[in-house]
C-alpha cells in the first residue's frame, strides 16, 4: 500500500514536471514569433542571394576579375556562410528562448560564427592595407600585386581567424576540465570572464577599426593628391603666360617624304632628329579616327608668334583646327630647313583637364606644299597622343575614385553595424544588468546585417557589379561579358 502510494505520488510528481516543462510559455507570442521568423528569414535569404550574385559576377565577368575584387570574393564567402548558418541558428535560439540543439552543435555554431566573422574583419583589413600600398607605392607595389599573392593573403586571413577562435571555443571545456555553460544556453565558455570579454572586443573590433580608419584617411588623401598631379595647374597658375608650355622642336628638311609623317612617329623628351620625334610609340592613329571617350585636346597651326597665338579650349571632344595654311613656293625653297615649335599645355576648366597643342613655325620662310602638310600631320599625331594621355589619366582617376568609394562604403557599413554590439560588450563588462535582452539580440543581429549590406555596397559603388547583377537576375548571360 505504501509502495502504491509512493508510486502514485512519484508518477503524479513526474507528470506535473512534464506538464510544467511543456506548458512554460515562450518569450514571445505566436504572432511575435511569426514576425521574427519572417524578418530574420528574409534577411537570411537576401544575404544568401546577394553574396551568391557577388561571387557569380566575379566568376563570369572578366572585367571584375581583379586583385581587389578577389578580396571582395573572399568577403562574400564569409558573408554567405553567415547568411546560411549563423543567421538561421541564432534566429532559432531567439524564437525558442533556449538552445535546443545540444552542446556539440552549440560549440560548432559558435566556432563557425566567430571564425567567419573574424575572417570578415581580416578581409576588410587586408583590403585597406592593400589599397594603401597601391596609392603610396605606385611604382613598386603593383609589380608584386599578383593573383598568387592575393590568394596567400586571403588564406592567411582565414587560417589566422581559425587558429584564434576554433581551438579555444571547441576545447576550452577540456582545458579547464568541465563545461560551465548551462544546459539550454549557448555562449563561449571562456568569455564568461568580463576581463577576457573586454580584451577580445578591443582586439577583434576596436583595434581593426582604428587601423582601417587611419588607412582610409591615408588612402583618400593619397588618391586626391595623385588626381591633382594630373591637373597640377591651379587658378593662379592659369594666369601665367604661355611660357609654362612644354615645347618641342621639329626640324623639317627636304629629305623627309610626305608619307613618312603618316606612318610612324617616335617621340623623345630630349629632342628630335630628321623630323621624327622619338618615344616608344609607333603606328599612332590620326585625329580623324572616332574616339569613344570625351577627352579633349586642340591644336592650331599659325604663323603668329607664340605670345600672340591663342589656345583653343574645349571641355569635351577633339578639335583639330589648322587656322591658316601656308601657300606653296618655288622649288628652290625645298632646300630650306625650318624649325617649328609644338607647344603642349594642360589647362583646367572646372573639374576637367584640357590639353591644347599649338604648332608655331619659328621662321618666316614658308615651305612648299609638301612640307607644309607635315606640321598638320604631326599636330594630328600629337592631338592623338594628348587625347590618349588625357583618357588614360581620367580612366585611372575614375578607377581610383571607384575603388576608394567602394572601400569607404564597406568600412562605413561595417562600423555602423558592428559598433552597437561592441559598445554593449564594454558596458556589460562593468554592468551586467544594464543591457536588456532584446537590445542584446538586436545588437548581435546587426552584426549579421552587415553581411546583407555588403553586396549592396558593391552594386551602388561599382556600375560593372550593378549591371552584372542585373544580367544575372534577368538571365541575360550573353550580355554579362559586355557589362561595363
Swiss-Prot record:
Keyword Glycosyltransferase applies: no
TM segment ranges: 33-55, 70-90, 108-129, 150-172, 195-217, 407-427, 442-461
Compositional bias (Basic and acidic residues): 260-270
Cellular localisation: Cell membrane; Postsynaptic cell membrane
GO MF annotation, one: G protein-coupled acetylcholine receptor activity
Keyword tags: Cell membrane, Disulfide bond, G-protein coupled receptor, Glycoprotein, Membrane, Phosphoprotein, Postsynaptic cell membrane, Receptor, Synapse, Transducer, Transmembrane, Transmembrane helix
Residue intervals on the Cytoplasmic side: 56-69, 130-149, 218-406, 462-484
Spans within the Extracellular topological domain: 1-32, 91-107, 173-194, 428-441
Span list, region Disordered: 255-316
GO biological-process terms attached to the record: adenylate cyclase-inhibiting G protein-coupled acetylcholine receptor signaling pathway; chemical synaptic transmission; G protein-coupled receptor signaling pathway, coupled to cyclic nucleotide second messenger; regulation of locomotion
Gene Ontology cellular-component terms listed: dendrite; plasma membrane; postsynaptic membrane; synapse
List of glycosylated residues: 3, 8, 14
Any coiled-coil regions, as ranges: none
Keyword Cell membrane: yes
Positions of disulphide bridges: 106-186
Topological relation to the membrane, as annotated: Multi-pass membrane protein
One Pfam family matching this protein: 7tm_1
Entry-linked PANTHER family: 5-HYDROXYTRYPTAMINE RECEPTOR (PTHR24247), MUSCARINIC ACETYLCHOLINE RECEPTOR M4 (PTHR24247:SF180)
Chain's role: The muscarinic acetylcholine receptor mediates various cellular responses, including inhibition of adenylate cyclase, breakdown of phosphoinositides and modulation of potassium channels through the action of G proteins. Primary transducing effect is inhibition of adenylate cyclase.
Family: Belongs to the G-protein coupled receptor 1 family. Muscarinic acetylcholine receptor subfamily. CHRM4 sub-subfamily.
Protein name: Muscarinic acetylcholine receptor M4
